[in-house]
């Protein structure tokens, strides 16, 4: 299986690197970090992320971007900055290379309030292709996590077999404090809101065999759904 670094390097030469029609290789290697923030002006913060890559370079990330909450907000300006790493070693080491709590960049501090940071391990093969995304934070007993992930893998296969370009992911938190402790992040990603909606239309109508039974089987193992968001995500940085 190719490493996340190999995948990101390949994306550097693709015009449609973050478009859903560009078929990237899925991997469960590597890791991600997310910096959860409250942005006073999300547009200004996103523009700053695009124009100033100093923080990304400092951490050594191979790719980075943002996710802006569109529905299900816990608070106004809810979003996070994500960074991809080729190993969990690199992901965890990044926290010592750049401390966002003590950011030397006054521009960042002036437009956002940091909530917390966390590292994530993908538990199933995941395609990095940001778009319009649903993020569901769930609690699954440790004894059921293997079955949960297995059903999500089958749900992903069902979507692909039915011709849907929707990517699924399951991520386990590492060092997430009291907010993310014992939490799994489930992500479902389409290119646009309309594309996402069409998948949901077919799922609820039952008109297409799309692996929905495996999604339901996975969620039957969930003890609690902590939160459920729709987010607009994009990649803004790729390492040279």
Stretch-by-stretch model annotation:
Residues 19-240:
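Short S/T/G/P-rich N-terminal loop/turn motif that feeds into the first structured element of a domain
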Residues 6-15:
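Bacterial N-terminal signal peptides
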Residues 1-4:
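Positively charged n-region of N-terminal signal peptides that target proteins for export
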């Amino acid at each position: 299986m190719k490493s996340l670094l190999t995948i990101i390097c390949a994306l550097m030469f693709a015009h449609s690197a973050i478009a859903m029609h560009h078929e990237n290789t899925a991997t469960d290697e590597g890791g991600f970090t997310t910096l959860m923030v409250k942005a006073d002006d999300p547009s200004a913060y996103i523009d700053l992320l695009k124009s100033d890559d100093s923080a990304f370079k400092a951490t050594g990330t191979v790719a980075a971007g943002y996710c802006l909450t569109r529905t299900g907000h816990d608070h106004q300006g809810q979003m996070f900055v994500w960074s991809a790493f080729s190993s969990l070693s690199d992901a965890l080491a990044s926290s010592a290379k750049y401390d966002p709590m003590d950011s030397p960049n006054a521009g960042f501090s002036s437009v956002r309030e940091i909530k917390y940071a966390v590292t994530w391990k993908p538990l199933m093969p995941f395609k990095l292709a940001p778009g319009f995304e649903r993020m569901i934070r769930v609690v699954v007993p440790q004894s059921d996590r293997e079955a949960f992930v297995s059903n999500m893998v089958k749900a992903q296969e069902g979507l692909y077999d039915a011709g849907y370009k929707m990517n699924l992911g399951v991520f386990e938190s590492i060092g997430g404090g009291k907010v993310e402790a014992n939490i799994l992040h489930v992500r479902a990603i389409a290119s646009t809101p309309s594309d996402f909606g069409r998948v949901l239309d077919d799922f609820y109508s039952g008109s297409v065999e799309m692996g929905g039974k495996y999604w339901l089987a996975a969620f039957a193992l969930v003890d609690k759904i902590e939160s459920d968001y729709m987010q607009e995500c994009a990649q803004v940085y790729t390492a040279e």
